[in-house]
Regions:
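His/Asp/Glu-enriched short active-site or ligand-binding loop at hydrolase and phosphoryl-transfer sites
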Residues: 141-151
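Ordered, amphipathic secondary-structure segments that act as subunit-interaction surfaces
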Residues: 76-93, 97
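Active-site mouth loops of central-metabolism enzymes
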Residues: 1-9, 57-75, 118-129
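Active-site-adjacent beta->alpha loops and helix N-cap segments on the catalytic face
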Residues: 10-14, 18, 30-54, 68-72, ...
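Structural motif
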Residues: 19, 48, 84, 138-140
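Hydrophobic faces of well-ordered beta-strands that scaffold small-molecule active sites
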Residues: 3-5, 24-26, 45, 53-57, ...
């Protein structure tokens, strides 16, 4: 089993590594549910930890329906994560109808290669979790991310996807 820890700064990344984490997910703005951290923080973490580093790609808090400006920022953030040697990125995009935005997700997944991609909390709030799961496999998203306290998919319910 892989232990992943969500961290918000360099100090917490170092503590996660010292505590035996296998991988970290680096975010900013915990009160907003996590957003993209600054490039300086990403670089500082990468220079100071040896475990896998996944970076949240989320331009703002709130919903997961992004306009063209948000989507542009997400593409550029992925480019920067690649330059900063992140091992993976974490994102999710929904349509206004609360379905996975397959077209935009596919574009970001292709842009992120060879980094790995994790589908994040947007997966939890889709109208149809089974449909989203099917899309995730078709898109070749590395893995879903479901927080332990997810209100929409309980640990028992998640076994339906296995």
């Amino acid at each position: 089993m892989i232990l992943e820890v969500v961290v918000y700064n360099i100090e917490s990344a170092l503590k996660a590594q010292a505590g035996g984490a296998d991988r970290i997910e680096l975010c900013d703005n915990p009160l907003e549910g996590g957003t993209t951290p600054s490039f300086g923080v990403i670089e500082g973490v990468r220079q100071n930890v040896s475990m896998d580093l996944y970076v949240m790609i989320r331009p703002r808090g709130g919903d997961f329906v992004y306009n063209n400006y948000d989507f542009y920022a997400m593409k550029r953030d992925i480019d920067q994560c690649m330059k900063l040697s992140a091992d993976g990125v974490v994102f999710g995009i929904l349509t206004p109808e609360a379905r996975m935005d397959v077209k935009r997700c596919r574009e970001l997944i292709q842009r992120a290669r060879p980094m790995k991609v994790t589908c994040h909390r947007a997966f939890d709030v889709t109208r149809d979790a089974f449909e989203a799961h099917r899309h995730r496999f078709r898109l070749v998203c590395s893995r879903p991310r479901n927080p332990p306290a997810s209100p929409s998919i309980s640990p028992a319910g998640f076994s339906r996807f296995a």
